[in-house]
Amino acid sequence: MINQKKIAGEKACEWIKDGMVVGLGTGSTVYYTIEKLGEMVNNGLHITGVATSEETSKQAQNLGIPLKSLNDVAEIDITIDGADEIDTDFQGIKGGGGALLREKMVASASLKNIWVVSEEKLVRNLGKFPLPIEVIPFGWKQIERTLEKEHIQTILRRQSSGEIYVTNNGNYILDIVNQTFRDAEMWQEKLAQIPGIVEHGLFLHYVDIIVCAKANGEIELIKK
């Protein structure tokens, strides 16, 4: 069986050159990118990674990839990350893995952003996948009520154990469901006006190259 995630994840490593500062995303596809980069580092490649989550940091450290914090780099040459959905306007939803805030901060500091996906992630309109919003625990119910007044349904993210999911930053995540985000700019503005929302999973002006793996194993490169 063809592993589309592995194919896409490893393909993106072709953009990595010696001496680069590389943003390391979070998720099941970029997992394979990091595994491949670990091999390349062990074979002599010199890079510095900037991890977008504790999970990614642990994986990179186990593979021997040198890391620095975002505070300790002036800029990032390339960030490779996954996405939950991408539309035809290069707008995306990210944050299914809970790392949206750090992912967006790292993406903002990057000269180039590459997203690695399997073909089902390419959609006409955003919204089949829930839109995560990271909120501070204090008063999160007020945020939920504010959105309810706008007829926006949210679900508080929980772990499989039933406990509330807590991000690496100590926050909660509300997932917006049953919405289509055709006017993503409007949604971005709306969410930015609600106190207590730390960040949202709309990534509207970030990605430069999409590495998309097809079911037959072929790779499609989609560039802005």
Swiss-Prot record:
GO terms for molecular function: ribose-5-phosphate isomerase activity. GO terms for biological process: pentose-phosphate shunt, non-oxidative branch. The active site is at E103. Its EC number is 5.3.1.6. It catalyses: aldehydo-D-ribose 5-phosphate = D-ribulose 5-phosphate. Substrate binds at T26, G27, S28, T29, D81, G82, A83, D84, K94, G95, G96, G97, K121. Pathway: Carbohydrate degradation; pentose phosphate pathway; D-ribose 5-phosphate from D-ribulose 5-phosphate (non-oxidative stage): step 1/1. Gene3D superfamilies: 3.30.70.260, 3.40.50.1360. It comes from the Bacteria. CDD domains: RPI_A (cd01398). Keywords: Isomerase. InterPro entries: NagB/RpiA_transferase-like, Ribose-5P_isomerase, Ribose5P_isomerase_typA_subgr, Ribose5P_isomerase_type_A. Homodimer. Catalyzes the reversible conversion of ribose-5-phosphate to ribulose 5-phosphate. Belongs to the ribose 5-phosphate isomerase family. This is Ribose-5-phosphate isomerase A. It comes from Listeria monocytogenes serotype 4b (strain F2365).
